[in-house]
Amino acid sequence: MIGRLRGILLEKRAPFLLLDVQGVGYELEAPLSTFYVLPAMGAEVILYTHLVVRDDAHLLYAFASEKERGLFRSLIRVNGVGAKLGLGILSGIEAESFTRCVQEGDTVSLTRLPGVGKKTAERLIVEMRDRLLDMPESGVAGMRPDRVDGSAPGTVAEAVSALVALGYKPNEASRAVRRLDTEALTTEEIIRQALQRML
């Protein structure tokens, strides 16, 4: 199993990354919580990974910290939660907020996440409550996202595309991004603010 990669960040187009490790390009999928803390393209980064082997593909999921990967692994063990939904949950809510929702039995907040209905929210609460007690405090490694001066039109399009990939409807994603003042924001910041408005 591939548990960790260290390499040069070649591409980042949420939710996909391309990481060059000693001349081999690894295609990775990552939650937006990881995108928020990635360095600029061309910089070296260490990512913790989870490999999923299917009949038709081998998929690598990347996380900024071991704790985040641990939460993802706990999520995909919940009945009805696959890797895509697990990434959506980590992208749509901070680990601390998710923990609070589970501990307090807050199905309303959980159902606001893309792909999470009432039954899935109830299952998450029941199955994750004990697992979260066994996990160390959640957190993300202390890396910072890159900043750009002025938001390019491609940045807005990338943000909308990332929200659609997370399960939001295209018109809903566009509407949420249009409501923001996107000037001088990175793609990750646009996505984060749009998600906060939609939740």
From Swiss-Prot:
Cellular component, GO, one term: Holliday junction helicase complex
Cellular localisation: Cytoplasm
Ranges where the record places region Domain II: 65-143
Region (Domain I): 1-64
Region (Domain III): 151-199
GO BP field: DNA recombination; DNA repair
One Gene Ontology MF term: ATP binding
Keywords, sorted A to Z: Cytoplasm, DNA damage, DNA recombination, DNA repair, DNA-binding
Region entry Flexible linker, spans: 144-150
Record has S-adenosyl-L-methionine as a keyword: no
A Pfam family this chain is assigned to: RuvA_C
Family, similarity comment: Belongs to the RuvA family.
Chain's role: The RuvA-RuvB-RuvC complex processes Holliday junction (HJ) DNA during genetic recombination and DNA repair, while the RuvA-RuvB complex plays an important role in the rescue of blocked DNA replication forks via replication fork reversal (RFR). RuvA specifically binds to HJ cruciform DNA, conferring on it an open structure. The RuvB hexamer acts as an ATP-dependent pump, pulling dsDNA into and through the RuvAB complex. HJ branch migration allows RuvC to scan DNA until it finds its consensus sequence, where it cleaves and resolves the cruciform DNA.
Assembly notes: Homotetramer. Forms an RuvA(8)-RuvB(12)-Holliday junction (HJ) complex. HJ DNA is sandwiched between 2 RuvA tetramers; dsDNA enters through RuvA and exits via RuvB. An RuvB hexamer assembles on each DNA strand where it exits the tetramer. Each RuvB hexamer is contacted by two RuvA subunits (via domain III) on 2 adjacent RuvB subunits; this complex drives branch migration. In the full resolvosome a probable DNA-RuvA(4)-RuvB(12)-RuvC(2) complex forms which resolves the HJ.
Free-text domain note: Has three domains with a flexible linker between the domains II and III and assumes an 'L' shape. Domain III is highly mobile and contacts RuvB.
Full protein name: Holliday junction branch migration complex subunit RuvA
Classification lineage: Bacteria, Pseudomonadati, Pseudomonadota, Gammaproteobacteria, Chromatiales
